[in-house]
């Protein structure tokens, strides 16, 4: 190599070394080859200039993906619910809070449509968008458990299974859904029901503090003393107020072993099983999670399932669940002592990534004969339809209605139903069959769980927050007056 060639090579290497790695990679991969068409909050079309996108990419520790990024973009744009096949203009795969702040500022300056993705498990597809920016938190997977203080610090890309397993090592449980690959962040912000919630409360009830980037790009800490309004709002108010970059949870002494599993009955005995469940659940102690519903069976025919989890003394649990196991003529009974993390994954296979699902849900405050009749007599007969009542009450009801933003505390169950579509050609049939069934059930409900409902009107969303709406609107006015964070159970600002 002659001196001139060596100098050119050295200069090129020096220039490359001065560029942030991800910007260099983006340029080399062709991801920033041209301007990028995008969509604003109002739906109008704009162009993101190449230079601005390059500068944004250079500010990130994480990776910035565009539609020309190839396989990486294709993988990152996909979400759990396969019904939503959207193509954002940008996906900012954030490595930390600074990246989140840069992404929020970039979006706000351009009035760009924003979706926030934690685990990507949003049933309504709100963790992605067409033409906007996805602030992707999935690379932020840190967990730190403090066994002395019984606390767990968790980043927003963490899935429930990861927190469950980390907690298990120390002998703790934090309620974290009933499907193990659900993202902790979205679950918590909307409330967060789990198999131990009757004993330990909702996921949001276990939040002691958060770090959150608000619409102006500022990173704020929120707890009972610092920014208490934000702390109140993120516990059940969804993603309305910003992007949470870390949660501090209470870690409850529990497990690692629980008694649980399912008892299966014939669909011919559906009404009898529902009535048994209603009577049994009415006197259940808070250590017991016991739900009931119908699901497609192994041969395609529907089956009735009583789903259980006992998180107290195991010998006592055997006695408590004995009547459940003895009732009727079960087709199967797999209740057993098992690891909590194993039971948490028991629903995963049927709810894997890419499933095409449409759902409706609502809270019930009683299981009247009229409700049971409506459930049974109007059953959705689609071969992929399902129905389930998740038990609530217990510790969930210990929290006052206005103590957090979560709007429903007096329910005895969360009634939900849905239909899985085999492919895109059958999506509308799945949607229509679910809606038709729900028409017979909705009048028996009192409010709904914001994490599980699709295509809900703004009027219904506002009504659902009840006495908490005024305070939520005030917080929205303060921290997101332009409604940058609107792909959620949206609280429209009034400024």
Which residues does each predicted region cover?
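Soluble FAD-dependent oxygen oxidases
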Residues: 2-495
């Amino acid at each position: 190599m002659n001196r001139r060639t060596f100098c050119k090579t050295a200069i090129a290497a020096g220039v490359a070394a001065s560029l942030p790695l991800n910007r260099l990679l983006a340029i080399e991969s062709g991801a920033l080859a041209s301007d990028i068409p995008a969509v604003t909050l109002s739906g109008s079309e704009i162009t993101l200039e190449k230079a601005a996108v390059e500068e944004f990419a250079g500010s990130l520790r994480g990776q910035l993906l565009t539609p020309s990024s190839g396989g990486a973009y294709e993988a990152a744009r996909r979400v759990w619910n396969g019904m939503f096949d959207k193509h954002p203009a940008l996906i900012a795969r954030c490595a930390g809070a600074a990246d989140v702040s840069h992404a929020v500022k970039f979006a706000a300056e351009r009035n760009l449509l924003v979706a926030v993705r934690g685990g990507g498990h949003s049933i309504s597809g709100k963790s992605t968008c067409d033409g906007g920016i996805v602030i992707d938190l999935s690379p932020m997977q840190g967990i730190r458990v403090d066994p002395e203080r019984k606390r767990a610090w968790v980043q927003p890309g963490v899935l429930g299974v990861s927190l469950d397993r980390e907690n298990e090592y120390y002998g703790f449980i934090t309620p974290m859904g009933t499907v193990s690959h659900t993202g902790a962040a979205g679950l918590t912000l909307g409330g967060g029901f789990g198999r131990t919630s009757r004993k330990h409360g909702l996921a949001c009830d276990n939040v002691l503090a958060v770090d959150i980037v608000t619409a102006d790009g500022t990173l704020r800490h929120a707890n009972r003393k610092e920014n208490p309004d934000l702390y109140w709002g993120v516990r059940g108010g969804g993603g309305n107020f910003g992007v949470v970059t870390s949660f501090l949870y209470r870690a409850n002494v529990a497990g690692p072993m629980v008694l649980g599993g399912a008892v299966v009955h014939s669909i011919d005995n559906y009404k009898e099983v529902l009535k048994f469940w209603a009577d049994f659940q009415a006197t259940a102690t808070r250590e017991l999670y016991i739900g009931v519903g119908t699901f497609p069976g192994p041969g395609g025919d529907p089956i009735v399932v009583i789903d259980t989890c006992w998180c107290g003394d195991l010998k006592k649990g055997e006695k408590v669940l004995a009547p459940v196991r003895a009732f009727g003529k079960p087709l199967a009974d797999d209740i057993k002592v098992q690891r909590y993390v194993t039971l948490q994954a028991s629903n995963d296979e049927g709810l894997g990534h890419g499933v095409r699902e449409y759902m409706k849900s609502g809270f019930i405050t009683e299981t009247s004969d009229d409700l049971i009749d409506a459930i049974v007599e109007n059953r959705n007969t689609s071969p992929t339809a399902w129905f389930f009542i998740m038990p609530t009450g217990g510790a969930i009801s210990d929290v006052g209605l206005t103590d957090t933003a979560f709007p429903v505390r007096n329910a005895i169950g969360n009634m939900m139903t849905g239909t899985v579509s085999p492919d895109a050609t059958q999506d509308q049939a799945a949607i229509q069959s679910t809606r038709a069934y729900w028409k017979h059930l909705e009048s028996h409900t009192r409010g709904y769980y914001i994490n599980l409902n699709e295509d809900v009107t703004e009027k219904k969303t506002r009504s659902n927050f009840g006495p908490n709406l005024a305070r939520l609107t005030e917080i929205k006015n303060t921290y997101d007056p332009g409604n940058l964070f609107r792909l959620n159970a949206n609280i429209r600002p009034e400024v």
